[in-house]
């Protein structure tokens, strides 16, 4: 399967990287000088560009060399502002009927915000995903990756399955703002426990250890939390897991975890079902996950 990636920056690059991992051949058509990601975020570019073919073409001058490749493609991926790809001569109307053409956009097609400029942080803000965490910034670009890239991969794979049945491709559109809103749409109905997964519960937080490292503590289920309290020598805390005063319980847990270094806690919990783990460094994670 040939994927031709016309996109710029993270969402498309991440999506085509996922398709590469699934066995696709990926050819990136870049502007003269290369994808801007290479200069703005070279580490991201190196990670997401590995294994792909790259070809520099000036679509503004002549789209024909690109079209030669697009006509062979099973999938075309782009992230221009709506309408730009068509004006450049590489839009969905310029590829064969069998092609799955995916447009990653900020706000979708046809709405009032169709032409609005934006980036990951803007989309999360518009989606309501930052309302109870601002001004804290997410550690990774959630709209780009979860809503944009993975949303694109899902729609592309579904369109390819449909093509197997009908012989026809499709133009699939991803809105990073709408996709981000779906990630938090459960809040519209109200949580049974306010902010259960975003700090509202003491049994779903990050705690500092004696050596300045941190533990991810997430025993949401009572059976896991009860075992944790037994292991730390405070079994009476099990009955307080869902108390109204979560800050008091969190203070108790913080005091407990601050007494020993990270390695000690990891050794204690290693063979136990307690849903506790480290906040690993990037280097540690790379080693552990290799």
Predicted regions span which residues?
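Glycine-rich beta-alpha junction loops
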Residues: 33, 105-108, 176-181, 211-213, ...
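Active-site Gly/Thr loop motif
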Residues: 192-204
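Active-site-adjacent beta-strand anchor residues
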Residues: 5, 78, 173-174, 217-218
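N-terminal helix-loop segment corresponding to the beta1-alpha1 unit
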Residues: 1-165, 192
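Flexible, small-/acidic-enriched active-site or ligand-binding loops
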Residues: 290
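Substrate-binding/catalytic subdomain of NAD(P)-dependent oxidoreductase enzymes
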Residues: 159-194
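Internal, well-ordered alpha-helical segments in soluble enzyme and binding-protein domains
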Residues: 118, 149-156, 168, 172, ...
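Aromatic-enriched alpha-helical interface/lid elements that frame and gate functional surfaces
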Residues: 203-284
């Amino acid at each position: 399967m040939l994927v031709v990636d016309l996109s710029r920056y993270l969402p498309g690059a991440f999506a085509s990287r996922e398709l590469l991992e699934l066995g696709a051949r990926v050819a990136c058509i870049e502007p003269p000088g290369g994808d801007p990601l290479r200069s703005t975020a070279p580490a991201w570019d190196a990670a997401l560009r590995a294994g792909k073919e790259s070809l520099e073409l000036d679509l503004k001058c002549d789209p024909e060399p690109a079209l030669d490749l697009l006509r062979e493609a099973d999938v075309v991926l782009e992230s221009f502002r709506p309408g730009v790809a068509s004006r450049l001569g590489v839009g969905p109307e310029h590829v064969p009927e069998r092609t799955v053409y995916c447009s990653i956009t900020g706000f979708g097609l046809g709405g009032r915000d169709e032409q609005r400029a934006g980036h990951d942080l803007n989309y999360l803000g518009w989606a309501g995903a930052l309302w109870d965490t601002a001004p804290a910034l997410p550690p990774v670009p959630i709209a780009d990756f979860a809503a944009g890239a993975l949303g694109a991969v899902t729609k592309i794979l579904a369109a390819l399955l449909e093509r197997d049945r009908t012989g026809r491709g499709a133009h699939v559109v991803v809105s990073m703002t709408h996709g981000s809103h779906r990630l938090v749409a459960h809040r519209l109905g109200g949580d049974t426990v306010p902010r259960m997964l975003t700090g509202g519960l003491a049994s779903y937080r990050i705690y500092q250890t004696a050596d300045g490292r941190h533990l991810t503590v997430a025993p949401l289920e009572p059976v896991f939390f009860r075992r944790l309290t037994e292991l730390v020598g405070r079994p009476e805390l099990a009955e307080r897991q869902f108390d109204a005063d979560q800050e008091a319980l969190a203070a108790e847990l913080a005091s407990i975890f601050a007494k020993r270094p990270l390695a000690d806690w990891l050794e204690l919990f290693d063979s136990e079902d307690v849903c506790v783990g480290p906040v690993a460094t990037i280097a540690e994670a790379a080693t552990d996950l290799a």
